Swiss-Prot record:
One of its GO terms (molecular function) is porin activity. It comes from Escherichia coli. The keyword Ubl conjugation does not apply. This is Outer membrane protein YedS. It is found in: Cell outer membrane. Induction: Expression induced by marR. PANTHER family: OUTER MEMBRANE PORIN N-RELATED, PROTEIN YDDL-RELATED. It comes from the Bacteria.
Length: 357
């Protein structure tokens, strides 16, 4: 029985970081949950001269989720999540706020919130952003328009299409201009939408977003708008998780040399199996091709692979609170392509131990 319970709990823990949250307050319709994890991790990289470099990448992550029952139909909610880098000396100021938002939910009419939250375009990328250590980096990233965690987003979400169609969900999002930062983190006004449908273990999602580029971003001559579209599908049942995603971006994806790619074509895939005794092996593939790029030497109009790797790894869950993991990244990026984008070509190996609650 313990093995069967573990097999059901682990997928939920992977998808939702707060699935194992500790309830710290629940009274008079107000509830507060506290969740987090402490991760001890080290990563080794194989350099071009066959030497190995390694670094500590340990961190801690904590969050609070609150809910207030205003009426029988109206609920207020909020969430805060914070990350602490444990690999640097004291006083290095490596902390960062991942999420901070608040909103209202009215029964089957849906929810509305505002703050720092996940961009709706990430709904498609989330299907394959499930690898052990790496993954989810073909086009999605934080503070890159509405492709990941980002600032100043107003989000409306509706589940089961107003209660009329089980499993049919949609979201609409607006992002205000953020220009008081480095050019690669800026964005103009924009909107995003996503639609997903889930039935009997299968899931399908489509997402699209379009944003104005700031004047500083548009100075590269690629255009005044940035956009992405993506489609993904998954199967999540019978201890199996398998997913694929394809997406394209325009004037949005940032290269390692801090230029924007005029266009990218991206593919990700992952398959995992959850054994009853706690082992969860994983195999993933991530690929991104850039079109009409700025090369490192300043030339424009070059095509090159941006990302190309296979990850093989596994978790072992002792229980719902404790696990260890390891992963190896086989970097397939050609050195000629890497020379254009200034991307790394090293293989990498990661090992870690996690306590989560």
């Amino acid at each position: 029985m313990k093995r069967k319970v573990l097999a059901m709990l682990v997928p939920a823990l992977l998808v939702a970081g707060a699935a194992n949250a500790a309830e710290i307050y629940n009274k008079d319709g107000n509830k507060v949950d506290f969740y987090g994890k402490m991760v001890g991790e080290r990563i080794w990289s194989n350099t071009d001269d066959n030497n190995s470099e390694n670094e500590d990448t340990s961190y801690a992550r904590f969050g609070v989720k609150g809910e207030s029952q205003i009426t029988s139909e109206l609920t207020g909610f909020g969430q805060f999540e914070y990350n602490l880098d444990a690999s640097k000396p004291e006083g290095s100021n490596q902390e960062k706020t991942r999420l901070t938002f608040a909103g209202l939910k009215y029964n089957e009419l849906g929810s509305f919130d505002y703050g720092r939250n996940y961009g709706v375009a990430y709904d498609a990328a989330a299907y394959t952003d499930m690898l052990v250590e790496w993954g989810g980096d073909s086009w999605a990233s934080a503070d890159n328009f509405m492709n990941g965690r980002t600032n100043g987003v107003a989000t409306y979400r509706n589940s089961d299409f107003f209660g009329l169609v089980d499993g049919l969900n949609f979201a609409v999002q607006y992002q205000g201009k953020n220009s008081n930062r480095g050019v690669t983190k800026q964005n103009g006004d924009g909107y995003a939408l996503s639609v997903d449908y889930n039935i009997e273990g299968f899931g399908f999602v489509g997402a699209y977003s379009k944003s104005d580029r700031t004047n500083e971003q548009a100075g590269d001559g690629y255009g005044d708008n940035a956009e992405v579209w993506s489609l993904a599908a998954k199967y999540d049942a019978n201890n199996i998780y398998a997913a694929m995603m394809y997406g394209e971006t325009r004037n949005m994806t940032v290269l390692a040399n801090d230029h924007f790619a005029n266009k990218t074509q991206n593919f990700e895939a992952v398959v995992q199996y959850q054994f009853d005794f706690g082992l969860r092996p994983s195999l993933g593939y991530v690929y991104s091709k850039g079109k009409d790029l700025y090369a490192r030497d300043g030339h424009k109009g070059v095509d090159a692979d941006r990302v190309n790797y296979i990850e093989v790894g596994t978790w072992y869950y002792f229980n719902k609170n404790m696990n260890v993991y390891t992963a190896y990244k086989f970097n397939l990026l050609d050195k000629d392509d890497a020379a254009i984008t200034d991307a790394a070509t090293d293989d990498q190996f990661a090992v870690g131990i996690v306590y989560q609650f």
